[in-house]
Amino acid sequence: GGISVPGPMGPSGPRGLPGPPGAPGPQGFQGPPGEPGEPGSGPMGPRGPPGPPGKNGDDGEAGKPGRPGERGPPGPQGARGLPGTAGLPGMKGHRGFSGLDGAKGDAGPAGPKQMGPRGPGERGRPGASGPAGARGNDGATGAAGPPGPTGPAGPPGFPGAVGAKGEAGPQGARGSEGPQGVRGEPGPPGPAGAAGPAGNPGADGQPGAKGANGAPGIAGAPGFPGARGPSGPQGPSGPPGPKGNSGEPGAPGSKAKGEPGPTGIQGPPGPAGEEGKRGARGEPGPTGLPGPPGERGGPGSRGFPGADGVAGPKGPAGERGSPGPAGPKGSPGEAGRPGEAGLPGAKGLTGSPGSPGPDGKTGPPGPAGQDGRPGPGPPGARGQAGVMGFPGPKGAAGEPGKAGERGVPGPPGAVGPAGKDGEAGAQGPPGPAGPAGERGEQGPAGPGFQGLPGPAGPPGEAGKPGEQGVPGDLGAPGPSGARGERGFPGERGVQGPPGPAGPRGLQGMPGERGAAGLPGPKGDRGDAGPKGADGAPGKDGVRGLTGPIGPPGPAGAPGDKGESGPSGPAGPTGARGAPGDRGEPGPPGPAGFAGPPGADGQPGAKGEPGDAGAKGDAGPPGPAGPTGPPGPIGNLGAPGPKGARGSAGPPGATGFPGAAGRVGPPGPSGNAGPPGPPGPVGKEGGKGPRGETGPAEVGPPGPPGPGEKGSPGADGPAGAPGTPGPQGISGQRGVVGLPGQRGERGFPGLPGPSGEPGKQGPSGSSGERGPPGPMGPPGLAGPPGESGREGPGAEGSPGRDGSPGPKGDRGETGPGPPGAPGAPGAPGPVGPAGKSGDRGETGPGPAGPAGPAGARGPAGPQGPRGDKGETGEQGDRGIKGHRGFSGLQGPAGPPGSPGEQGPSGASGPAGPRGPPGSAGSPGKDGLNGLPGPIGPPGPRGRTGDAGPVGPPGPPGPPGPPGPP
């Protein structure tokens, strides 16, 4: 057979226009708040270097010194009294207010990102809080000096450390600060506090515009021809004809050879033979070649990270709207850092079922799920009869009937109305949950709406009131002390555990309308959905242009033998042709059925003695025929010269066909002869093997079919979160605003770049065979095609009885006078076929008168089958015919009735996860988020340095006189 050469690749088709954006889904109702999830425990990154110390605030202006009090008149000098009893300890002073926090230092560089994939281990439990650092020693108490005048208030210092509660001694000058204690190592993070109330969800972005359709792929190469079907059964042979009447003996004819007479009129065509069985269906052809990949889109611009908004409470899942068109697949972005697990949202309401999608390719069968138990529900109502189903399994082949004459094809019938759908039965109980499928590829984000604000969180716990101290005596104002040197800020303390969540503030005012963002990257491909219902049949497309004639295909398997056509009218007598060369001996044919006995022929020339044949079975003796009258004996003449070879006689009747011979070597191609007259239209033969398809050329696109456009597939799961942005500087707490109105919807974003073409998926399994459509009218018969090369086909089954072969040449007259016909003897065994002898020489004597023809004997019984003859010589190769043109395409038959929707196939395995898309462009600044919960109390501040000793105060008033 020939080698299949794929044709050149056709040009790419025009690029499709982007589809319209999908309609937004309805706003969902607020669902109950979800249960708080377990706190995540990712590995703690290395601690960054400490930031530079913050700048100290400018000192405030010095207060004006107070006026000294007027000096009173000196009292009388009293006697020196006895030492009085020790006074009671003074009341504990009120605790001073905590100093304001210093400016926050610049954040140190972030530690290295954890780029590796998330480990499969379970979440770790939160570690226990580490021990607090050792506290520094308190400074020694200085001696109490006289109280000085009260100086002006200095600038607020850094918060001092809370000292231990002690007994108030006599107030002295502040001692110098003791050595600072060693800072303790930070302990492991303590248990996470209760999660604060979630913020309002941000509005979802607009769906991206539908990407351009890729160029159509090149049509796949056609499949190889199917295997040859089995031949039909051999028809029974007809009974022998009746015996003809005996002819009268004719007058002796002239020895001169007359010219051949005109050909007789052809008889009427015989009845058609029985139609053979249809051949078996061929194997499916190989998978077609994949189409060319589409153009790769450019990477999208990388956006700037937006400010982190306060997360609102997760609203309930709204009803599932019609998903928008899938955006183009963006360029792969950098792998994001795995985020901590979020709180699980509340289960959304069941969405309305979507429209049936287009027919997907049948995926490989999935694992069979467990059979569900029968539910206790009542049986459903009986549905109405549905539309015609698929044909059932093919029954056993019946006995072949006699083929009738082929009728004229009728006009196509009208399409019947579709049957009514059956009523839905009562819903049964849910079956057991099947195994969890693999995670589908990420789909595009749907157009969600902002949910309603969630309920307010629980109010925070009120702090415990401190113990009220005893108010101390108001001392005399001391003198203003000298301004101390500027101290350095202390190191930041260990972060304490988070405090309880405070009450939730009111919703802020709505912000400005944000600009439309660019469409996000195309998500991974989702799982294949269930097979949708069969769509309505499309209109007949425009007939494509006839493609160029392809190279001759390899010789296909021989087709089934066609029915014998009617015999054509006899042609005019042809001129006597020149004798051809003797061909190679052909293969022996099988013994044909015994025909009726022919009339007695004239004796032929004596041939060479044939080889001794095998002895056949003896046949029964035939009846003796009547003895004819003896003819006159002629004079024996002298042998004459050898005559010229006679011309070929008229063609005889066609003999039975022989068995298929062995394939000989191909002969040389002969010259093309003149085209013969058109023959009668024969019956349609069996379907031959399919040849190879020539190079595919893309024809003009046909008109769109009348079927409805399928709805897009379901949204895929959410993608992995992106890398967190740098931590911003903490702002001051804003005023709680009133809840604002919802902003207007932004304009749809620009279409994103076209993504890379997806990889070719595995070839789906063959679908079920549909019902056969009505047969269309026969197409115009094309001219005969070129004969293919002779292939080494398998030996076929014996053929049916063929038409009688051409009559052989008439033998030459022998040299002797014709003898008297003898009585017919018993039929002897059939000998082997003798070789053709050389032409005998013509005798010199005159030909004797021909004896009267004997009466025709009855038909003898069928003799035994003869031995296989010698293989004949191979004939010359026939003239190569012109290749015919392709026949015109017949009109399409009426569309068949739509079949019932088949059961949903098993979900195919999830495809490989595509690379993450590139980051989208930054959106506008969002609304001011709600104030976060009050953070935990800051670390304990460092004890400030002791100030300088103030100047001595004025003398106090004289004490009371002592006891006498």
From Swiss-Prot:
Gly residues composition-biased segments: 294-303
| Biased segments, Pro residues type | 146-158, 620-632, 771-781, 815-830, 949-964
* Localization, UniProt: Secreted; Secreted, Extracellular space; Secreted, Extracellular space, Extracellular matrix
Location of 4-hydroxyproline modifications: 18, 21, 24, 33, 36, 39, 53, 68, 74, 83, 89, 126, 147, 156, 159, 186, 189, 201, 207, 216, 222, 225, 240, 249, 252, 260, 269, 284, 290, 299, 305, 323, 332, 338, 344, 353, 356, 365, 374, 379, 391, 400, 409, 412, 430, 447, 453, 459, 465, 471, 477, 489, 498, 510, 519, 537, 552, 558, 579, 585, 588, 597, 603, 621, 630, 639, 651, 657, 666, 675, 678, 704, 712, 721, 739, 748, 751, 757, 772, 778, 784, 792, 798, 818, 821, 824, 895, 898, 916, 931, 937, 952, 955, 958, 961, 964
Per the record, residues carrying 5-hydroxylysine are 92, 243, 314, 531, 642, 807, 868, 880
Q: Which residues are glycosylated?
A: 92, 880
Q: Which residues carry this modification: Phosphoserine?
A: 98, 567
Q: Which GO terms describe its cellular component?
A: extracellular region
> Which residues form each disulfide bond in the chain?
none
Instruction: Tell me which tissues or organs this protein is expressed in.
Output: Expressed in bones.
Please give the residue positions where the record annotates the modification 3-hydroxyproline: 665, 936, 951, 954, 957
Q: Where is the composition biased (Low complexity)?
A: 106-117, 126-144, 192-231, 347-373, 381-400, 459-468, 564-578, 591-618, 647-663, 709-721, 850-864, 898-931
The UniProt annotation puts the region (Disordered) at 1-964
Q: How is it modified after translation?
A: Contains mostly 4-hydroxyproline. Proline residues at the third position of the tripeptide repeating unit (G-X-Y) are hydroxylated in some or all of the chains. Contains 3-hydroxyproline at a few sites. This modification occurs on the first proline residue in the sequence motif Gly-Pro-Hyp, where Hyp is 4-hydroxyproline.
Q: Which InterPro entries match?
A: Collagen (IPR008160), Collagen_Structural_Proteins (IPR050938)
Keywords on record: Extinct organism protein, Extracellular matrix, Glycoprotein, Hydroxylation, Phosphoprotein, Secreted
List compositional bias (Basic and acidic residues) regions by residue number: 56-70, 865-879
As a miscellaneous remark, the entry gives:
These protein fragments were extracted from an ancient humerus epiphysis bone collected in Haiti.
* Annotated function: Type I collagen is a member of group I collagen (fibrillar forming collagen).
Instruction: Name the family the entry cites.
Output: Belongs to the fibrillar collagen family.
State whether it acts alone or in a complex, and with which partners, per the record. Trimers of one alpha 2(I) and two alpha 1(I) chains.
Name-wise, this protein is Collagen alpha-1(I) chain
